[in-house]
Protein backbone atom coordinates (compact mmCIF):
# COMPACT_ATOMS: atom_id res chain seq x y z
CA UNK A 1 0.00 0.00 0.00
CA UNK A 2 1.39 3.35 -1.01
CA UNK A 3 1.54 6.09 1.62
CA UNK A 4 -0.14 9.35 0.82
CA UNK A 5 0.98 12.38 2.80
CA UNK A 6 -1.56 15.10 3.45
CA UNK A 7 -1.12 18.77 4.18
CA UNK A 8 -2.78 18.42 7.59
CA UNK A 9 -1.89 16.95 10.93
CA UNK A 10 -3.73 14.22 12.85
CA UNK A 11 -5.69 16.74 14.94
CA UNK A 12 -6.93 18.60 11.85
CA UNK A 13 -7.94 15.32 10.21
CA UNK A 14 -9.79 14.34 13.40
CA UNK A 15 -11.69 17.64 13.43
CA UNK A 16 -12.73 17.07 9.81
CA UNK A 17 -13.94 13.58 10.65
CA UNK A 18 -15.88 14.86 13.68
CA UNK A 19 -17.50 17.54 11.53
CA UNK A 20 -18.67 14.86 9.10
CA UNK A 21 -19.97 12.64 11.92
CA UNK A 22 -21.88 15.44 13.65
CA UNK A 23 -23.39 16.60 10.35
CA UNK A 24 -24.36 13.20 8.97
CA UNK A 25 -25.52 11.18 11.98
CA UNK A 26 -28.40 11.75 14.37
CA UNK A 27 -27.01 9.38 17.00
CA UNK A 28 -23.39 9.44 18.09
CA UNK A 29 -22.06 6.79 20.47
CA UNK A 30 -18.49 6.66 21.75
CA UNK A 31 -17.19 3.32 22.99
CA UNK A 32 -15.02 3.99 26.04
CA UNK A 33 -12.81 1.16 27.33
CA UNK A 34 -10.89 3.23 29.83
CA UNK A 35 -7.71 3.01 27.78
CA UNK A 36 -5.70 5.98 26.58
CA UNK A 37 -6.99 5.90 23.00
CA UNK A 38 -10.69 5.78 23.82
CA UNK A 39 -10.16 8.32 26.62
CA UNK A 40 -8.58 10.77 24.20
CA UNK A 41 -11.30 10.19 21.60
CA UNK A 42 -14.03 10.70 24.19
CA UNK A 43 -12.54 14.02 25.28
CA UNK A 44 -12.09 15.19 21.68
CA UNK A 45 -15.72 14.33 20.86
CA UNK A 46 -17.08 16.09 23.95
CA UNK A 47 -14.93 19.18 23.35
CA UNK A 48 -16.11 19.31 19.72
CA UNK A 49 -19.73 18.90 20.79
CA UNK A 50 -19.45 21.74 23.34
CA UNK A 51 -17.92 24.08 20.80
CA UNK A 52 -19.99 23.37 17.68
CA UNK A 53 -23.05 21.27 18.56
CA UNK A 54 -23.98 22.03 22.18
CA UNK A 55 -27.52 20.69 21.77
CA UNK A 56 -26.46 17.34 20.30
CA UNK A 57 -26.70 14.32 22.60
CA UNK A 58 -23.72 11.98 22.81
CA UNK A 59 -23.93 8.43 24.13
CA UNK A 60 -20.97 6.85 25.92
CA UNK A 61 -20.81 3.05 26.09
CA UNK A 62 -18.54 1.18 28.49
CA UNK A 63 -18.52 -2.64 28.58
CA UNK A 64 -17.26 -3.62 32.03
CA UNK A 65 -15.49 -6.99 31.98
CA UNK A 66 -15.28 -7.06 35.80
CA UNK A 67 -11.61 -8.17 36.03
CA UNK A 68 -9.42 -5.23 35.10
CA UNK A 69 -6.78 -3.08 36.74
CA UNK A 70 -8.08 -1.11 39.72
CA UNK A 71 -6.62 2.14 38.38
CA UNK A 72 -8.46 1.58 35.09
CA UNK A 73 -11.75 1.12 36.94
CA UNK A 74 -11.06 4.25 39.01
CA UNK A 75 -10.31 6.26 35.85
CA UNK A 76 -13.49 5.01 34.18
CA UNK A 77 -15.58 5.91 37.22
CA UNK A 78 -14.02 9.40 37.51
CA UNK A 79 -14.50 10.05 33.81
CA UNK A 80 -18.12 8.89 33.65
CA UNK A 81 -19.01 10.87 36.78
CA UNK A 82 -17.38 13.97 35.29
CA UNK A 83 -19.33 13.75 32.02
CA UNK A 84 -22.67 12.35 33.25
CA UNK A 85 -24.45 15.69 32.79
CA UNK A 86 -23.24 16.15 29.22
CA UNK A 87 -23.66 12.63 27.82
CA UNK A 88 -25.93 9.60 28.07
CA UNK A 89 -23.89 6.97 29.91
CA UNK A 90 -24.27 3.23 29.35
CA UNK A 91 -22.00 1.37 31.80
CA UNK A 92 -22.82 -2.24 30.91
CA UNK A 93 -22.17 -4.97 33.51
CA UNK A 94 -23.80 -8.05 32.00
CA UNK A 95 -22.69 -11.71 31.91
CA UNK A 96 -21.69 -11.91 28.26
CA UNK A 97 -19.53 -14.77 27.02
CA UNK A 98 -15.93 -13.59 26.82
CA UNK A 99 -13.09 -15.69 25.40
CA UNK A 100 -10.60 -16.64 28.06
CA UNK A 101 -6.96 -17.63 27.82
CA UNK A 102 -6.67 -18.44 31.52
CA UNK A 103 -8.27 -21.88 31.54
CA UNK A 104 -7.54 -25.13 29.76
CA UNK A 105 -11.02 -26.37 30.64
CA UNK A 106 -13.31 -23.48 29.72
CA UNK A 107 -13.29 -21.43 26.51
CA UNK A 108 -15.46 -18.65 27.92
CA UNK A 109 -15.70 -16.60 31.05
CA UNK A 110 -18.84 -14.71 32.02
CA UNK A 111 -18.11 -11.45 33.84
CA UNK A 112 -20.81 -10.41 36.32
CA UNK A 113 -22.34 -13.91 36.29
CA UNK A 114 -25.27 -13.50 38.69
CA UNK A 115 -25.17 -17.22 39.57
CA UNK A 116 -21.58 -16.88 40.84
CA UNK A 117 -21.57 -13.60 42.76
CA UNK A 118 -19.29 -15.11 45.39
CA UNK A 119 -16.59 -15.34 42.69
CA UNK A 120 -16.85 -11.76 41.47
CA UNK A 121 -13.49 -10.00 41.37
CA UNK A 122 -14.99 -6.75 42.69
CA UNK A 123 -18.31 -5.25 43.71
CA UNK A 124 -20.87 -4.29 41.08
CA UNK A 125 -20.60 -0.53 40.38
CA UNK A 126 -23.45 1.36 42.02
CA UNK A 127 -24.35 4.25 39.72
CA UNK A 128 -27.66 5.25 38.17
CA UNK A 129 -26.28 4.65 34.68
CA UNK A 130 -25.01 1.09 35.31
CA UNK A 131 -26.90 -1.52 33.29
CA UNK A 132 -26.99 -4.96 34.92
CA UNK A 133 -29.31 -7.92 35.43
CA UNK A 134 -31.06 -6.23 38.36
CA UNK A 135 -32.67 -3.93 35.77
CA UNK A 136 -34.10 -6.84 33.79
CA UNK A 137 -37.49 -8.03 35.01
CA UNK A 138 -38.72 -11.28 33.53
Predicted features, each with a name:
Residues 1-136:
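ATP-dependent adenylation/nucleotidyltransferase module used to activate substrates
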